[in-house]
A protein has these predicted regions:
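Membrane-proximal intracellular helices of multi-pass ion channels
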Residues: 1-321
């Protein structure tokens, strides 16, 4: 829970100043605009902290009203908003077997995955801040698309009732894409369509300025904008095309920084996956374990490290990696 607020404060107050990984994009957002109402970074962090504690309390109350004990409600609210995923049961959030708890958890994970600076702007009176943020638009659109597709797959191909399919897809997809790690079913057994989806969304994470880990949605936006601009240059060599993020032009420095981040991320992932494979793990376990470790998700894929497995059975050398 403390790590969750720490990630937010770093993303808002520190990383933009360090100008690494494309985070300098948020220097104007987290410093200049917010300083009009809250002049110092410490005040911004304090306001974000109040929001964070408030959301934790709201989700604890919701879990309690949904049927959890007071202790379980508080414990799960702390790991839901922080997208940490720790549960008081080995069966994770699925232990409670409650649709109400599942959907409340899904909503909490989404809340934790959105930019907290936007919550602050909303409370300051900018009611359109959340809807106008393109990073939020991309993230929620991606989540909705994945839920619809996976629900359809479970319903049509796995013969699961539509209501159950929607519930399973919603909770587990949101959990993995946000890096929370709650599970209610072994999604590794959902078939050939679901397996690659869960593998690739491990890398995504949520929005910058949220409690999530992963690559973050804004970097995919910058990558897309840069690639789109290059394609336009190829088609019209004499044209002038400028990549944009959130309706603001993206500098070459930001693009270079984001591309460097992608390179270092996947270089580290490749080394880790190859190392796990060298130690005797099968392809699926090695690659998904590397992905879930570097993205700080939790469950991987396969019988060893999947939702129904545990890293305990891995060789000691693999655990060190």
């Amino acid at each position: 829970w403390l790590g969750g607020i720490g990630i937010i404060v770093m993303a808002i107050a520190i990383l933009p100043l360090l100008r690494v990984g494309g985070m300098q994009l948020f220097r104007m957002e987290s410093s200049d605009q917010s300083e009009k109402a809250l002049p110092r970074a410490a005040q911004i962090a304090s306001a974000i902290g109040v929001i964070y504690v408030g959301l934790t309390g709201i989700w604890a109350l919701g879990y309690w009203l949904a049927g959890m004990s007071g202790f379980n409600a508080l414990a799960h609210s702390m790991t839901t908003i922080a997208t940490g995923g720790f549960s008081t049961s080995d069966q994770s959030i699925g232990y409670f077997n409650s649709p109400l708890i599942d959907y409340w958890a899904a909503a909490g994970m989404l809340v934790g995955a959105l930019p907290f600076i936007v919550y602050l702007k909303t409370l300051q009176g900018d009611w359109r801040a959340l809807a106008a943020d393109t990073q939020v638009q991309w993230f929620l659109s991606l989540v909705a698309l994945l839920i619809l597709a996976t629900t359809g797959w479970l319903w049509l191909e796995n013969n699961i009732a539509f209501e159950d399919a929607a519930r399973l897809a919603t909770v587990n997809l949101i959990s993995i894409i946000t890096g929370t790690g709650y599970v209610t079913d072994d999604f590794g057994m959902w078939g050939s369509f679901a397996l690659p989806i869960f593998f690739f969304i491990m890398f995504v994470g949520g929005c910058a300025g949220s409690t999530t880990c992963g690559i973050k949605v804004f970097r995919f936006q910058v990558l897309y904008a840069s690639a789109r601009t290059q394609v336009h240059h190829l088609l019209q060599p004499h044209g002038v095309f400028i990549p944009y993020y959130n309706h603001q032009p993206i500098s070459d420095e930001v693009i270079t920084s984001v591309l460097s981040f992608f390179f270092m991320w996947f270089f580290a992932f490749s080394l880790l996956a190859l190392g796990l494979g060298f130690l005797g793990l099968d392809f699926l376990t090695a690659f998904s374990s590397a992905a879930t470790s570097i993205a700080n998700v939790g469950p991987a894929l396969g019988p060893i490290a999947g939702p129904e497995g545990t890293f305990k059975t891995m060789p000691d050398e693999a655990k060190w990696l």
